[in-house]
């Protein structure tokens, strides 16, 4: 059954106009992006199959152009449309979260980066630099890869802090396993940066470890 054969009230575009985007399911929103189906499938069937292939939005968010276009019915043009929409969503999320964002509690720091970091396949060590009002003034990825105290050097962390005239900073890194429990290396890095910050007068407020929809604050755990 082609989309044009559906009643108006069941077509995704008409439903969006009549009831709002928030009322549409994920596969209906994706169908609007795809626009057309195949000879054998309506666009709604194609979008449903695409989501099933990637186990929903979680893995679709990480898909490459090659992975998308390898799926029957999804050529390069449709793959590019999907990737562009995903990137716009990330950028909008980034603007909403980072516009004079204030960090006062561990939850604030976790929420600031959870959307960006929870699905990363490698560990990313990020420093968030704050002014005297605890407003975010800059964010920098210092290191990508397995964390240890010899690789995360204080020089790289504090060079950016001094450049930005930061009053304090927060470290955030992810555990791709989804389990945010701190390792011995996590604790060692935290203590080393804390000691360096005391010497320079730039306080390490916390070290947040991001898991899958959960986090651990090393300050709350007593390591700072």
From Swiss-Prot:
The MPN domain covers 102-224
Q: Which region is the signal sequence?
A: none
Q: Which GO terms describe its biological process?
A: proteolysis
Q: List the protein's name.
A: UPF0758 protein BLi02933/BL00636
Domain of life of the source: Bacteria
- Give the record's family classification: Belongs to the UPF0758 family.
Between which residues do disulfide bridges form?
A: none
Binding positions for Zn(2+) per the UniProt entry = 173, 175, 186
InterPro entries attached here?
MPN, RadC_JAB, RuvA_2-like, UPF0758, UPF0758_CS, UPF0758_N
CDD domains associated with the record: MPN_DUF2466 (cd08071)
- Give one GO term, molecular function aspect: metallopeptidase activity
Identify the residue span(s) of motif JAMM motif.
173-186
Keywords in UniProt for this one? Hydrolase, Metal-binding, Metalloprotease, Protease, Zinc
